[in-house]
């Protein structure tokens, strides 16, 4: 097995530069072919939303994995308010079936092509303002190793049970 090259990225009220948000954005911009985002609470700030949609516009295959229904009422509405913009940009949104809650938190870039220098981040940080600035969080950056392959396999397992959101119904 390949050795994993890891770096811990802490964040919280004592970190005024929002290191997790900056690293999430950096990984999104790093993606060349494929980007996978997985978060139970995907409520991006303007910079992350712009980074993700721009990745689509430059030809990156972007997948977002979320719960079909979040376990918190307000989060569910906040998260779903971004779906139209994401779908219009070309993001493929996969919803983990209700009543289960997808609680994994990770991002992978270019996992299918080792020549593209795949990267992965996982940890306690959701992709929302609370995790980026209010809560104390720890995220691990994986720059090399078989952990990236394991997360890519996890994505395949999720995709097998998820429903793809193709459009929003407006009533």
For each of these PLM feature ranges, what is it?
Residues 1-169:
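Charged, low-complexity intrinsically disordered terminal segments
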């Amino acid at each position: 097995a390949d050795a994993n090259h890891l770096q811990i990225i802490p964040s919280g009220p004592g970190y005024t530069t929002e290191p997790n948000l900056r690293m999430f954005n950096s990984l999104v911009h790093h993606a060349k072919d494929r980007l996978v985002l997985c978060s139970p609470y995907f409520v991006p700030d303007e910079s992350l939303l712009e980074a993700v949609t721009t990745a689509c516009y430059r030809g990156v295959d972007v997948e977002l994995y979320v719960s079909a229904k979040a376990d918190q009422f307000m989060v569910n509405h906040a998260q779903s308010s971004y779906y139209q913009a994401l779908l219009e940009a070309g993001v493929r949104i996969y919803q983990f079936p209700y009543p289960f809650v997808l609680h994994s938190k990770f991002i992978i870039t270019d996992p299918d092509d080792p020549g593209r220098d795949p990267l992965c981040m996982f940890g306690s940080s959701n992709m929302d303002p609370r995790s980026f600035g209010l809560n104390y969080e720890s995220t691990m950056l994986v720059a090399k190793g078989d952990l990236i392959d394991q997360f890519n396999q996890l994505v395949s397992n999720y995709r097998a049970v998820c429903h793809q959101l193709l459009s929003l119904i407006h009533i």
